[in-house]
Amino acid sequence: SNRTSKNEMRELFPESASFGTPKPERLIERIMRLSTDPGDWVLDSFAGSGTTGAVAHKMGRRWIMVELGEHCHTHIIPRLKKVIDGEDKGGITEAVDWKGGGGFRYYHLAPSLLEKDKWGNWVINKAYNPAMLAQAVCKLEGFVYAPSDTSYWQQGHSTERDFIYVTT
């Protein structure tokens, strides 16, 4: 029930405000048992409090979570650290004999490279500084972004003889 999941969140984060609509770990576990096998990928594109990722991790599934709000910092990252460290004793931990382990990577997406100006023309986003622009162009053109310490014009490379220089 929703009450169960709120209690799970209070155990994990006694000092912070409860998340508005957490899902109980047992519900997510049941859905995953019916639809996935260990090692499968689970995607939660509205991660919220991180329940799906926590359950997937405890059940030996690989997972991707996406969250645009601050929940990443207030709930998801601290929660997953507790799962990995074996400090999360609630939810399905006992049922799946979870002891801790594993890890995760956190990525922060950059703003969109292009935006429309007031006339509707596509222009480089003002949020990009020259280094960010060079990195984005390297990525788009298949170069490795690796600015040289000795040559200003070598911001990236694709081979030993192919270099890229991006100017603004």
Region locations from a protein language model:
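Short alpha-helix at the nucleotide-sugar/activated-sugar donor binding site of glycosyltransferases
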Residues: 46, 57
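Glycine-rich SAM-binding Motif I of class I
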Residues: 50-54
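Accessory, often C-terminal, charged low-complexity segments
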Residues: 1-3, 25-39, 59-168
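Conserved class I S-adenosyl-L-methionine
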Residues: 40-45
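Class I SAM-dependent transferase core
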Residues: 3-22
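Active-site nucleophile and cofactor-binding loops and adjacent substrate-binding regions
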Residues: 21, 47-48
